[in-house]
Structures are given as C-alpha cells and as structure tokens.
C-alpha cells in the first residue's frame, strides 16, 4: 500500500479516536473547536497571546469550552461565574495542579506550587502557618518589608535624579524580602551571589514564558532531541537548588530548635519532628523545591507589578498627585509608611488594586487539574484533565468595571470616595489554590509604592500622553515594555 495512503488513514483514525473520546467515556466534555490529529487546536492558539485566543474562542463556544493542546484536552473557564463555580464552589474538585512536562523535569511534583494531593496539602499548610504566624521570631514580616523599603529608597537616591531603567532595583527589593524570610538575612544590592541568584530567576521567567517553551510542553519529545533555551532553564534550576542546599547545610550546622530564625529553620525542625514517619513529606528534596517555589512566586511577580505600576503612574500624573497628597496628609515626610496607614488611605489602596487589575499579570492563571471525575454544568470532566481559568475575563469584566481597558482607581471607590471591595478582584487567583504569598505581596506593593512616592517625584523621559502602557504579553504572563525614568527627590 502507498505510504501516503497509510499515513492519511492513520491520521484519520487518530482524528476519529480523538472525537470519540471527546463525546464518550462517561460523558461529554464541553464543546470546542475540532482538534486536528496530533496537533489538536494549536494552530488556533496564538502562543504569544493565549488570552486573546481564548477570548475569541469564548465568543463562539461560550464560557466553558475545550481546546486540545496537542492530543490532551484542556477545559477553559471564561468569565466570573464559570471561574468562581470551578475554583470556589467546586474548590476541592478543581484543586489539582496540571504538571507540565517542563515542571515534571524541573521539580518532579515536589514543593508547594506544582505538587498535588497529600503532599500539597501538608506543605502548603505548613508554609502558610510559618509565613503567617512566624512574625519571624523577634521581627515581623512587616518589619522586614519596611527595612527593605528604606533600602530601596536609599538605592534610588543614588541615581541622583538621572534617567535609569528601574527593572533591577524594583526586582532586588522583593527578592531581598524573600531572602530575609527564607535565609534570615538580606543581601546588599551589589552582592555577587545575590546578583547571580536574581539573574537565574529572571532568565528562567523570560524563557518559561516564551512561545518555544509552550510548544515544548505540548510536544515534550522536542526537549530530549533538540537544542534550545529549555536546557538553560534546567541549568538555572540546578544552580538555584545547589545554592539552597548550601544554605540548608549552613542552617543544619547552627540550628537551635528552640529559636528558629527563618523558614529553613522551621522546615528543618519539622523534619526532626517527623524523622520516624516513613511517609513524611518533610524531606530535604521538598525543602529545596518549596524554597525555590517561594522565591519564584514571591520575587518576579511583585517586581513586575511595581515596574508596571510606576509606568502607569507616570502616564496618569493626576492619579499620582492624588496619591501623594494622601501620603502627605496621612503619613507625612518624617516616618516610614506602615500597614496601619492603608485603612486611612482609600485612594492609594484603590490605586494599588487598580494597578493589579489593569496589568492582569497572569492572564490565564496557573493551570489547574481536576482531582476526580467532575460533572460541571451539563458536562463531564474526567479526573486529571487540565483546566485553564481566565483571570482576564474576570479582571476586565465590563459589567463589574465600567471602563475595564482604562486605568482608573475609581473602579475601587464608592460614591463617597471610600475603598470598595470587589469579588472580581482575583489577581492572586481564588479558592484552594489562591497564591500562598498574597498577604506578603499586598504588603510589599503598598509599602514599596508609598515609600517611593513619599520620597520622589516620578519624571518620565517623554510626555505622559506618549507613554505606551500596552502590555507585552508573552506566553503565560503580561508585563510592561522596558522604559527609563528619573527619581527626583521630593
């Protein structure tokens, strides 16, 4: 038989099998575009802006639909009601984490972000309790953030009002807070070890959000046989793991179980308490993975939000003026901002919320997975199915936010100028997998931004009306374009 005929028959069989699986096997998956054999729907997805592709598909197939990334189905929840129904109302059923091939190679399902089941529940519970209750012994986390805010201000003063790219400085501050929480001590901004650590994380974030890595996750065989930036990701993670391992060894040698100094000490003490438990999840491997997760989640996301936030404030000087007036009235010039100030600063609070809403940092959330067979509305979603929840569709909902594509702190203010909460505000996701570092990130954003605006006037290099705040969307996240500004001492 002609090889071409054989190939066509095989592809046809694969297509029929794919369609059969979509409509049988215990029920019916949500509707969606017809997948091609092997390729699935990847030709209908723009991997430079996945969120836009999902928006277009939702107009055709509704708020719950299925796309095939290669041969694997992914169910998409679009809009507030669908996202809430999945992540909150059916929180346990949708609390799994879809482990991509890249993540399988990097952390093997360890840690807290990409783990599942008993491991995830135990590590997450421990991490939350440690970060929440620790007050870190003698010093609260707020103390550490305030210290870093003062260091950030001093570092910005060293620019002497000259034009600068704020990317590094705004990345160093949240990274140092994590260092303080994890390792007890912060680093000098010019410390070579600190610079290397930040460099590895930043490079990995850039690569992991590239279209090439999205393709590698769909066709993992490419990683085994082709050169590419995925190799750099593995090398960088090895560097970070070795760094954490060295720090862990130092902690083991000086550990005082009655006086834990930081997160690593608390984890090591927990390991000692469970040393006779053969099924314990508290191992050196899980410690390294968890610390790496905390770094990854707590550094780049906050720094990107800060950098984008300053760009928006330069674009909208009328907003900046109102925030600075509120800072002057409530805090003044002679003390550092603290979290107690926030309740008396509704406009500033609304501005921080609006920055997060507008930039829509992680448009499609971190992928979830079903933990069991789920009947969702009139559909059947098998256990282990990947689930994407569109945060864009919630944060930019035009019923909740009157001008969703415009930057306007009024979205979070009532008619009297008081701060107004919104159930649609979920930049940290929602439900059982809500970002573990949400409280810390909110604290950092408020304290860092108020400290900067208390001490400096933001001076753009171009007219505010010419500033481009259009997000650069790449793979799984959005960020601001590179820019320079001057920090003029107030």
UniProtKB/Swiss-Prot annotation:
Keyword Signal on this protein? no
What cofactor is this protein dependent on? heme
Any single GO molecular-function term of the entry would be: iron ion binding
What is this enzyme's class at the first EC digit? oxidoreductase
Q: Which Pfam families match?
A: p450
Q: Name one GO biological process term.
A: organic acid metabolic process
Key words, A-Z:
Endoplasmic reticulum, Heme, Iron, Membrane, Metal-binding, Microsome, Monooxygenase, Oxidoreductase
Keyword Iron belongs to the record: yes
| Enzyme Commission number(s) from the entry | 1.14.14.1
What induces it, per record?
P450 can be induced to high levels in liver and other tissues by various foreign compounds, including drugs, pesticides, and carcinogens.
Q: What is the lineage of its organism?
A: Eukaryota, Metazoa, Chordata, Craniata, Vertebrata
Q: Where in the cell is it found?
A: Endoplasmic reticulum membrane; Microsome membrane
Would you tell me the protein name for this molecule?
Cytochrome P450 2C14
Q: Which gene encodes it?
A: CYP2C14
In UniProt terms, what function does this protein have? Cytochromes P450 are a group of heme-thiolate monooxygenases. In liver microsomes, this enzyme is involved in an NADPH-dependent electron transport pathway. It oxidizes a variety of structurally unrelated compounds, including steroids, fatty acids, and xenobiotics.
Give me the residues that bind heme, please: 435
GO cellular component assignments: endoplasmic reticulum membrane
Q: Which family does it belong to?
A: Belongs to the cytochrome P450 family.
The principal location of this protein is endoplasmic reticulum
Annotated catalysed reactions: an organic molecule + reduced [NADPH--hemoprotein reductase] + O2 = an alcohol + oxidized [NADPH--hemoprotein reductase] + H2O + H(+)
Query: Which organism is this entry from?
Result: Oryctolagus cuniculus
The way it spans or sits in the membrane comes to: Peripheral membrane protein
């Amino acid at each position: 038989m002609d090889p071409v005929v054989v190939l066509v028959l095989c592809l046809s069989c694969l297509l029929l099998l794919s369609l059969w699986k979509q409509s049988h096997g215990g029920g019916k998956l949500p509707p969606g575009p017809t997948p091609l054999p092997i390729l699935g729907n990847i030709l209908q997805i723009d991997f430079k802006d996945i969120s836009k592709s999902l928006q277009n598909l939702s107009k055709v197939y509704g708020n719950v639909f299925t796309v095939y990334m290669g041969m694997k189905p992914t169910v998409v929840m679009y809009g507030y009601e669908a996202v809430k129904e999945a992540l909150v109302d059916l929180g346990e059923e949708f609390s799994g984490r879809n482990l991509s091939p890249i993540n399988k190679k990097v952390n093997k399902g360890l840690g807290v972000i990409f783990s599942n089941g008993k491991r995830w529940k135990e590590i997450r519970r421990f991490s939350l309790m440690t970060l929440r209750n620790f007050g870190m012994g003698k010093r609260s986390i707020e103390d550490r953030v305030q210290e870093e805010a003062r260091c950030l201000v001093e570092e910005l003063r060293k620019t002497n009002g000259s034009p600068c790219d704020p990317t590094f400085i705004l990345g160093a501050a949240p990274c140092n807070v994590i260092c303080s929480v994890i390792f007890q001590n912060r680093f000098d901004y010019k410390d070579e070890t600190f610079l290397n650590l930040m460099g590895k994380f930043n490079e990995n974030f850039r690569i992991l959000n590239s279209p090439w890595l999205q393709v590698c996750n769909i066709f993992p065989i490419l990683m085994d046989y082709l050169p590419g930036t995925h190799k750099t990701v593995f090398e960088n993670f090895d560097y970070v793991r070795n760094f954490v391992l060295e720090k862990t060894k130092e902690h083991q040698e000086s550990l005082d179980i009655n006086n834990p100094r930081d997160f690593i000490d608390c984890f090591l003490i927990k390991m000692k308490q469970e040393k006779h438990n053969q099924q314990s999840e508290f191992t050196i491997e899980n410690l390294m993975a968890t610390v790496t997760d905390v770094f990854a989640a707590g550094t780049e996301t906050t720094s990107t939000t800060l950098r984008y936030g300053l760009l928006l404030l330069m674009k909208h000087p009328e907003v900046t003026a109102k925030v600075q007036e509120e800072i002057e009235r409530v805090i003044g010039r002679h003390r550092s901002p603290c979290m107690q100030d926030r309740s008396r600063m509704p406009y500033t609070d609304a501005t921080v919320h609006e920055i997060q809403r507008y930039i829509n940092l992680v448009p499609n959330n971190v992928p979830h997975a079903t933990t069991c067979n789920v009947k969702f509305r009139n559909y059947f979603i098998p256990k282990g199915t990947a689930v994407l929840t569109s945060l864009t569709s919630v944060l930019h909902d035009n019923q909740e936010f009157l001008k969703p594509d415009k930057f306007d702190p009024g979205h979070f203010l009532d008619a009297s100028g008081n701060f107004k909460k919104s159930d649609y505000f979920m930049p940290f996701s929602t439900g059982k997998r809500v970002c573990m570092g949400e409280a810390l990130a909110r604290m950092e954003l408020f304290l860092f931004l108020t400290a900067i605006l208390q001490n400096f006037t933001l001076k753009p290099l171009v007219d505010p009306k010419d500033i481009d705040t259009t997000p650069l969307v790449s793979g799984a996240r959005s960020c601001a374009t590179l820019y320079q500004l001057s920090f003029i001492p107030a």
